[in-house]
């Protein structure tokens, strides 16, 4: 039997993606999935179908990570966000391919969307230690005391990314929240569907984005 014939008889081994919650990739509580298909209608993978319990677990994980993330200095948060931009830039080709695979509309715009996403991360990384100077204020009062306006993290922020620009939309919303010390529970069906086509892009944002424990 020839090598070409043996290769053609192989059964495809498809990637089974998981849900990213609290710094780890886990299975959905329901155990259910739905098929993800590319722009040509070809099956790519079974995507986990999350439940309300999965969402609650995500909110609880974000709330638990919040204090340690908010306690970091603005400069350190900027470093972490900038590191994510570096990692996305280094694997831009993989993300381009993942975006193109699932929509013909992204064929010409995928590269531009990834580039804009990197730029957006750099933008927010630069604002990490500056936004307090812009939004904070010393308020004038007619009394013998000081009155200041300061910014404080709100806590857990929920975001739903646009389907039109799934990567740029998700990152723009999430970065704006985490730069000021908040944690995020993000939903993006289009981006999740795209990421199953390329395993690496789904993994490398996890490390720099996860609010790690302080030493």
Q: What is each stretch, according to the model?
A:
Residues 11, 64, 74-76, 96-97, ...:
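A short alpha-helix capping/helix-coil boundary motif
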């Amino acid at each position: 039997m020839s090598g070409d014939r043996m290769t053609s008889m192989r059964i495809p081994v498809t990637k089974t993606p998981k849900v990213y919650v609290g710094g780890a990739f886990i299975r959905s509580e329901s155990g259910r999935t739905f098929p993800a298909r590319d722009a040509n209608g070809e099956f790519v993978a079974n995507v986990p179908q999350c439940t309300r319990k999965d969402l609650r677990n995500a909110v609880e994980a974000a709330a638990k990570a919040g204090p340690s993330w908010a306690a970091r200095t603005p400069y350190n948060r900027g470093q972490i966000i900038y590191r994510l931009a570096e990692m996305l830039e280094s694997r831009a080709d993989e993300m381009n391919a993942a975006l193109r695979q699932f929509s013909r509309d992204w064929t010409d715009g995928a590269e531009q969307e990834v580039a804009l996403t990197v730029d957006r991360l750099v933008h927010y990384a630069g604002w990490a230690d500056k936004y307090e100077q812009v939004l904070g204020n010393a308020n004038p009062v007619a009394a013998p005391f000081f009155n200041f306006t300061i910014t404080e993290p709100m806590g857990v922020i929920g975001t739903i990314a646009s389907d039109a620009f799934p990567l740029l939309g998700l990152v723009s919303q999430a970065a704006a929240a985490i730069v000021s010390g908040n944690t995020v529970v993000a939903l993006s069906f289009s981006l999740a569907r795209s990421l199953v086509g390329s395993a690496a892009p789904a993994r490398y944002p996890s490390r720099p984005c996860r609010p790690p424990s302080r030493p």
